C-alpha cells in the first residue's frame, strides 16, 4: 500500500508537467509540418533553386533528420513499455551525435560565408558594413618589373620553372595534430564553471580528503606490514653504480627504463614536500578558484652566440 501511495504521488506531481510538454510538442509538430509542406510545394514549383546547394548543409540536415527519427522511435518504444537494450537505434544515435560534434568546428568556420551567401541571395548585394568592402585591391599587387626584365628572367630561369612545376602537383599531406575538444562556442562563464568542476574533482581525489574519509569512516582500517624488496634492490644497484663511477672515473649511461624507475621513486618522495599544503581543497571550501587550466608560460632561454675560437697552426 505504501509503494502504491508513493507511486500515485509521483504521478500526480509529474502529470501536469507531462501534459504541458505534450501540448507544446503537439503545437510545434503542427507548426513544423505546415512549414515543411509550404517549402515542399515551393520546391516542386521551382520557386527555389536547390541544384547548387552546399553539400555540407545537406549532410548536416540529413543527419539531424535521422537523429530526430531515431529519437521518435525510442520515445514510442518507451511509451509502449518495451526494453531498449541492444537496440540498433541507440547505436545510430551515438554515431550521428559523434559526427555532428566533429562537424561543429567546420560549421563555425563556414558560418560567415554561408550568412554572406544567404544575405546576398535575399537582398542582391552586400551590406555596407561587410568586411569584404575593405579588402585589398588585387590590381595594386601587379609586379612593377618591365617586360624586358621579365623576358630575361624567363630566359635564365626557364629550367628552374620547369623543375618547379612538378612540385606544384604534389599531393598535400595535412600536418598531424593531436585531437582536442572543441570549445569555441563556450562563453567565459561556461569555461569558469568547467574549471571549478575540474578543481572539485581534483580536490576529492586529494590525499587530504582521502585521509579524512578514512579517519571518519566506520569501515575497518586495513594495515599492511610488508617490505619493499624492489626498492631495496634499486637502492643497492644505485649504490653499486655510484661506487663504480667514482672508482673508475667514468660516467655510465642510463637506459630509458632506469630513468623511468628513478622518476617514479622521486615522485613518491616528492609528496613529503606537499604534506602541509591545503590549497588543493579550496574548491570545496568556497575559496578562490585558481586558474589551473591556463598555466603561466615558461620563459624561453635565449642562448647568446659568442665568438668562435680559432686555433692557429704552429709554424
From Swiss-Prot:
It is found in: Nucleus; Nucleus, Nucleolus; Chromosome, Centromere; Cytoplasm. GO terms for biological process: maturation of SSU-rRNA from tricistronic rRNA transcript (SSU-rRNA, 5.8S rRNA, LSU-rRNA); regulation of translation; ribosomal small subunit biogenesis. The keyword S-adenosyl-L-methionine does not apply. Residues 296-315 have a biased composition (Basic residues). GO terms for cellular component: axon; chromosome, centromeric region; cytoplasm; dendrite; filopodium; nucleolus; small-subunit processome. Residues 159-168, 182-200 have a biased composition (Basic and acidic residues). InterPro entries: Sas10/Utp3/C1D. The keyword Coiled coil applies. Keywords: Cell projection, Centromere, Chromosome, Coiled coil, Cytoplasm, Nucleus, Repressor, Translation regulation. Residues 127-201, 289-315 are annotated as: Disordered. Its main location: nucleus. Residues 181-206 form a coiled coil. Part of the small subunit (SSU) processome, first precursor of the small eukaryotic ribosomal subunit. During the assembly of the SSU processome in the nucleolus, many ribosome biogenesis factors, an RNA chaperone and ribosomal proteins associate with the nascent pre-rRNA and work in concert to generate RNA folding, modifications, rearrangements and cleavage as well as targeted degradation of pre-ribosomal RNA by the RNA exosome. Its dissociation from the complex determines the transition from state pre-A1 to state pre-A1*. May inhibit mRNA translation. Belongs to the SAS10 family. Part of the small subunit (SSU) processome, composed of more than 70 proteins and the RNA chaperone small nucleolar RNA (snoRNA) U3. This is Neuroguidin.
Amino acid at each position: 500500500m505504501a509503494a502504491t501511495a508513493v507511486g500515485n504521488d509521483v504521478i500526480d506531481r509529474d502529470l501536469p508537467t507531462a501534459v504541458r510538454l505534450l501540448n507544446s510538442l503537439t503545437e510545434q509538430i503542427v507548426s513544423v509540418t505546415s512549414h515543411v509542406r509550404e517549402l515542399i510545394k515551393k520546391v516542386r514549383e521551382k520557386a527555389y533553386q536547390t541544384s547548387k546547394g552546399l553539400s555540407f548543409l545537406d549532410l548536416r540536415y540529413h543527419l539531424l533528420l535521422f537523429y530526430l527519427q531515431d529519437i521518435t522511435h525510442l520515445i514510442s518504444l518507451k511509451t509502449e513499455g518495451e526494453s531498449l537494450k541492444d537496440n540498433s537505434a541507440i547505436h545510430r544515435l551515438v554515431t550521428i551525435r559523434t559526427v555532428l560534434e566533429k562537424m561543429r568546428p567546420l560549421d563555425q568556420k563556414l558560418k560567415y560565408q554561408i550568412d554572406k551567401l544567404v544575405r546576398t541571395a535575399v537582398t542582391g548585394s552586400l551590406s555596407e558594413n561587410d568586411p569584404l568592402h575593405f579588402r585589398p585591391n588585387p590590381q595594386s599587387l601587379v609586379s612593377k618589373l618591365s617586360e624586358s626584365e621579365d623576358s630575361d628572367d624567363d630566359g635564365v630561369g626557364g629550367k628552374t620553372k620547369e623543375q618547379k612545376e612538378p612540385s606544384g602537383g604534389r599531393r598535400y599531406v595535412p600536418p598531424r595534430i593531436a585531437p582536442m575538444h572543441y570549445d569555441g562556442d563556450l562563453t567565459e562563464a561556461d569555461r569558469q564553471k568547467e574549471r571549478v568542476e575540474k578543481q572539485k574533482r581534483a580536490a576529492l581525489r586529494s590525499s587530504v580528503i582521502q585521509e579524512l574519509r578514512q579517519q571518519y569512516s566506520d569501515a575497518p582500517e586495513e594495515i599492511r606490514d610488508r617490505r619493499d624488496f624492489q626498492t631495496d634492490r634499486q637502492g643497492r644497484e644505485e649504490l653499486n653504480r655510484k661506487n663504480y663511477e667514482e672508482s673508475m672515473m667514468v660516467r655510465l649511461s642510463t637506459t630509458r627504463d632506469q630513468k623511468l624507475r628513478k622518476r617514479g621513486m622521486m615522485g613518491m618522495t616528492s609528496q613529503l614536500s606537499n604534506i602541509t599544503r591545503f590549497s588543493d581543497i579550496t574548491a570545496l571550501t568556497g575559496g578562490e578558484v585558481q586558474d589551473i587550466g591556463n598555466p603561466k608560460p615558461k620563459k624561453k632561454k635565449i642562448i647568446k652566440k659568442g665568438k668562435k675560437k680559432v686555433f692557429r697552426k704552429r709554424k
